[in-house]
């Protein structure tokens, strides 16, 4: 029988792992070992093999360990894909209906979490794209020309190029997290996003009910007259 492992289940598993790794009940360690690599491939650095999940392999790990380091709460963060804002790139926009039958435009992603609807700028500020210039003439959006840099609560355009993009500011990555966790392909999510008073205004602004921030016109219609007529 087939099963669907949803994105929400993956997020829950990640949260549970972080919670377990940072609690006082469990202890996690990172180790180095394998002092005699004669029998192993020299291409591991660029092409590591898939791990063998067996009791024999686990015994080998223990037998060849040299040193361990305990993982503390400051050593763990949840991570997301890193989309560094670049001029001329067409980004996806946030939509709650992305699926295999209704893919993101223009990336073709089959789920919200695999689409490129958020970016980080050169100052490590993170934004969600609420509108990517989609209109009846540009059904897959337009290239982004203005880098978002603002920290306003309300969504807005990043500049005056007229690229059609509307961005919403989320958070700024802490310098300590940048130094420890930032990489080419992934960036950290704040560990105190849900509790920090510094993020409270952004959280509250994003969760108020009854808001309509973006309206996208996908069909202008026909035969409806001009705007200066009375009906």
Describe each model-derived feature in a short phrase.
Residues 1-126, 130-231:
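Feature for peripheral, non-core segments
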């Amino acid at each position: 029988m087939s099963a669907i492992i949803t994105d929400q289940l993956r997020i829950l598993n990640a949260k549970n792992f972080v919670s377990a790794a940072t609690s006082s009940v469990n202890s996690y360690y990172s180790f180095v070992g394998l002092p005699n690599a004669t029998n192993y491939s020299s291409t591991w650095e660029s092409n590591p093999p898939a791990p063998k999940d067996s009791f024999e392999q686990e015994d080998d790990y223990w037998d060849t360990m040299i040193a361990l380091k305990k993982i503390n709460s400051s050593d763990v963060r949840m991570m997301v894909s890193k989309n560094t804002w670049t001029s001329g790139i067409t980004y996806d926009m946030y939509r709650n209906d992305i699926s295999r039958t209704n893919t993101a435009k223009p990336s073709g992603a089959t789920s919200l979490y695999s689409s490129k609807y958020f970016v980080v700028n050169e100052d490590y500020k993170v934004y969600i794209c609420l509108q990517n210039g989609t209109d009846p003439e540009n059904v897959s959006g337009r290239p982004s020309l203005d880098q978002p840099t603002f920290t306003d609560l309300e969504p807005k355009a990043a500049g005056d190029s007229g690229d059609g993009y509307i961005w919403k500011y989320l958070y700024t990555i802490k310098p300590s997290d940048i130094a420890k966790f930032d990489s080419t392909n992934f960036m950290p999510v704040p560990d105190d996003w849900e509790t920090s008073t510094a993020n409270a205004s952004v959280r509250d602004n994003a969760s108020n009910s009854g808001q309509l921030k973006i309206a996208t016109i996908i069909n202008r219609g026909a035969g409806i007259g001009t705007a200066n007529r009375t009906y």
